[in-house]
Amino acid sequence: MPNSTSQVTKLKSKNNEFSYTADAVSIYLHKIGRVPLLSHEQEIFFAQQVQQMMVMFTAKEELAEKLQREPTLQEWADKMQLKEDVLLQQLSQGQIAKQKMIQANLRLVVSIAKKYQKRNLEFLDLIQEGALGLERGVEKFDPTLGYKFSTYAYWWIRQGITRAIAQQSRTIRLPIHMADKLNKIKCVQRELSQKLGYIAGVTEIAQALNLEPSQIREYLQLVRQPVSLDMRIGFEQDTQLQDLLKDDGMSPERYAERELLYQDIHNLLAKLTPQQKEVLILRFGLAGGCELTLVQISQRMGISRERVRQVEKQALTLLRRYGIDSRSYLAD
């Protein structure tokens, strides 16, 4: 009979864990919700400062490559044709502007992360990866192109989240290009299913993506996740998965019998001539290979089929002289 106290304890533990996660998310959402959105003019102003900072970092990297060492502050300032204090001031302004753009757009990160929940990554982890993508978007954004930053940042945030899912949520990591292909297949499958009114099959997906059905099946095989044999299952969580799986492997007793049999066969074959030994090995697959016909053996050994038959008969007759019934071994 299940232990009710144990069940209650486990349920409380799970509820406490869920409550902690939910509280952390609530606190985070409340915190970022207090940050005001930027106006279009502010986006342009801060983006220009960030771009100026990125130009400085690029110049520093070029200088380091040329000098084959880390440049001094004076060398860096000379490269930018600025005084040291002006260089430091513009770097500081760039960092502040970058943080303002990131903080003002974290709600966009949360909005995108919600679409990727239940992908084997915690919600807060999705947000963190999306924030890293947002940071990259801030560094790359060119305000002179005229579009809103949120439109540009959306792609970077989404890429950060999807790549993290591809790299971290699987026991066996998939290459990025394969993960992207899987996401494309899933997206097309959803669209086709909505359009057709039933779950789209492999052939329909393949036609939509201009691929062969075999390619789609190969990609879909990669979606399968490995499962730990130590995973606990059941209501009480007191049974391991491996305890319920049939072991098709050889038992220790059977393994010992087989090894003794191999040793006996080796001793038997040692009593034969090299030609007789080779014929029996090939004829009965004693070396772990397939059993060959008389014709196949004759072709391999370069002798006639009749000669192979004679050698086989001689070998078996010789073994019987030693009082050994070879059929019991060869049948095994």
UniProtKB/Swiss-Prot annotation:
Residues 294-313 bind DNA. GO terms for biological process: DNA-templated transcription initiation. Keywords: DNA-binding, Plasmid, Sigma factor, Transcription, Transcription regulation. InterPro entries: RNA_pol_sigma-70_dom (IPR014284), RNA_pol_sigma70 (IPR000943), RNA_pol_sigma70_r1_2 (IPR009042), RNA_pol_sigma70_r2 (IPR007627), RNA_pol_sigma70_r3 (IPR007624), RNA_pol_sigma70_r4 (IPR007630), RNA_pol_sigma_r2 (IPR013325), RNA_pol_sigma_r3/r4-like (IPR013324). It comes from Nostoc sp. (strain PCC 7120 / SAG 25.82 / UTEX 2576). It comes from the Bacteria. Sigma factors are initiation factors that promote the attachment of RNA polymerase to specific initiation sites and are then released. This is RNA polymerase sigma-B factor. Disulfide bonds: none annotated. The gene is sigB. A motif (Polymerase core binding) lies at residues 125-138. The lineage of its organism: Bacteria, Bacillati, Cyanobacteriota, Cyanophyceae, Nostocales. SUPFAM superfamilies: Sigma2 domain of RNA polymerase sigma factors, Sigma3 and sigma4 domains of RNA polymerase sigma factors. One of its GO terms (molecular function) is DNA binding. PANTHER family: RNA POLYMERASE SIGMA FACTOR RPO (PTHR30603), RNA POLYMERASE SIGMA FACTOR RPOD (PTHR30603:SF60). Belongs to the sigma-70 factor family. Pfam families: Sigma70_r1_2 (PF00140), Sigma70_r2 (PF04542), Sigma70_r3 (PF04539), Sigma70_r4 (PF04545).
